[in-house]
Amino acid sequence: MMKKYQITEWCHKFIKDHVQPGDCCIDATAGNGNDTLVLCSLVGETGSVIAFDVQEMAIQNTKKRLEEHGVLERAKVVLDSHIHMAEYAEENSVSCITFNFGYLPGGDHNLATRKESSIEAIHEGLRLLKKGGMMSLCIYSGGDSGFEERDAVLKELKQLDGRKYLVIVSEYYNRPNNPPIPAMIIKL
């Protein structure tokens, strides 16, 4: 059977190398709760996950997914923008932050992430990451603002101080139709 190479699965491989039981993690774009669930399973009973989304439907979907897997108590699921994540976690305390830019699968495509708030949230998240912590970014393009957001985020990542952050950007090189771009930032 041929293995699927989804962007989120690729990112999860890196996340699993960086998250330990007892860690604090953030899912900056909770969506349907897939990344939140992965993070909750990795932090164990002694860790915690804070998941953000601006859509009530995403909050309910995430809570339901976590409850179905018996890990809801490990997460704080917050109806708020990821630009406010510093109000919920201390600087230099977070092991991993995940972002999936774009719109909620199955949701309103008009409610999508935007370049300005996404870049602001990335910088907020970098302050929260502890040394050795990582940020996973799944950058989708297309839609009304996707190309603008993709280009702005990639430009911003390129400008991060190389003495403080290692930025790895990959791409599905031979796939048509603007496939998503996985990126990782490790705080040095």
Locations of regions flagged by a protein language model:
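Class I S-adenosyl-L-methionine
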Residues: E148-L188
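Conserved SAM-binding loop of SAM-dependent methyltransferases across substrates and taxa
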Residues: N32-T46
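Conserved SAM-binding motif I beta-strand of class I
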Residues: S48-D53
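Conserved beta-strand signature within the Rossmann-like core of class I S-adenosyl-L-methionine
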Residues: T29, A121, L128-I139
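Helix-to-beta-strand junctions that scaffold the AdoMet/dcAdoMet cofactor pocket
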Residues: Q20, V43-G44, L129-K131
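Mobile active-site "lid"/loop adjacent to the S-adenosyl-L-methionine
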Residues: F99-A121
